[in-house]
Amino acid sequence: MGVESVRCPLHFTKMQGAGNDFVVLDLRDGTPPPDAALVAWLADRHFGIGCDQVIAIEPPRGVGVFAAYRIWNADGSAAQQCGNGARCVAAWLVRDGSVATEHFLIDSPVQTHSVRCIGKDEYAVEMGLPVFEPERIPLSGFPNALGEYVLSLQGEVLCCGAVSMGNPHAVVEVDLIDVAPVERIGPLLQQHSAFPESVNVSFVQVIDPGLVRLRVYERGAGETLACGSGACAAAVVLMQRGRVGRDVRVVLPGGTLRVQWPVSGGPVTLSGPARCVFDGVWYG
């Protein structure tokens, strides 16, 4: 479904999870997914609808799964993982009447997610196992004894953690989140040769063992009000270092998420809000 061939009017739902906002399309009837140009047009906040990412809900791919979805960044590039998006897909299915149970499965591009409704407009999604092996993040290089990667950025030395939550993340711990160099360091890390597929960059400040503050510079979107996989990445990196406990509240500019990782060999769970903002029709 490209810009020239898109069927107008195009019905959509605007959704948000902790301020991370999405244009959601129902493509379960077999309508082709949007191409990169159409995604960028829809995501444009001046000439389109406006969002951080576009989500297409598609027929399920496996037994026992209620639906599958694909997700694209605002620049039209494909995304593999999105915790806030997964919760919004779950909320969309519940609102649509497609799901009548509190616990169900949905397919993302990289895995099947177990989702639970835990309250009004609140969902918990199982995000899978974090991956720390550098070649699987992917990341060239090896961590030091503290689990940090030491990188050179235009003459500066930067230490960061790294993990894949289905997509690559770098985690930079800072003293004061409000003055963190997000707009400067974020693009530099994304363009660094150590990250062959680029990277999402999380800047995190530890408040206490159960609370952190976070800002995320996302691939293909820039800084967003919230990033669910970024919250998981920051939390598990800090847990590995013993900086926080296994159940952490993550405060982002758009709201608060909860990350739980009870055991190192088990899956990470992300909890937080997912809400419908409005239904609309796009005329192109």
From Swiss-Prot:
Q: Which GO terms describe its biological process?
A: lysine biosynthetic process via diaminopimelate
EC class of the enzyme, as a word: isomerase
Which sites are catalytic? C82, C227
| GO function term, MF aspect, one | diaminopimelate epimerase activity
Where does the entry annotate site (Important for dimerization)? F278
Q: Where are the bilayer-spanning segments? A: none
- Site annotation Could be important to modulate the pK values of the two catalytic cysteine residues: residues: H169, E218
Reaction(s) the record says it catalyses:
(2S,6S)-2,6-diaminopimelate = meso-2,6-diaminopimelate
> Where does it live in the cell?
Cytoplasm
Q: Its annotated pathway?
A: Amino-acid biosynthesis; L-lysine biosynthesis via DAP pathway; DL-2,6-diaminopimelate from LL-2,6-diaminopimelate: step 1/1
Superkingdom, taxonomy of origin: Bacteria
A Pfam family matched in the record: DAP_epimerase
Could you tell me the keywords of this UniProt record?
Answer: Amino-acid biosynthesis, Cytoplasm, Isomerase, Lysine biosynthesis
Any one cellular component term from GO for this entry? cytosol
Tell me its EC number(s), please: 5.1.1.7
Isomerase as a keyword? yes
Question: Which residues of the sequence carry a binding annotation for substrate?
Answer: N20, Q53, N73, G83, N84, N167, N200, E218, R219, G228, S229
* Chief location bin: cytoplasm
Briefly, what is this protein's role? Catalyzes the stereoinversion of LL-2,6-diaminopimelate (L,L-DAP) to meso-diaminopimelate (meso-DAP), a precursor of L-lysine and an essential component of the bacterial peptidoglycan.
- Partners and quaternary state? Homodimer.
Write the protein's name: Diaminopimelate epimerase
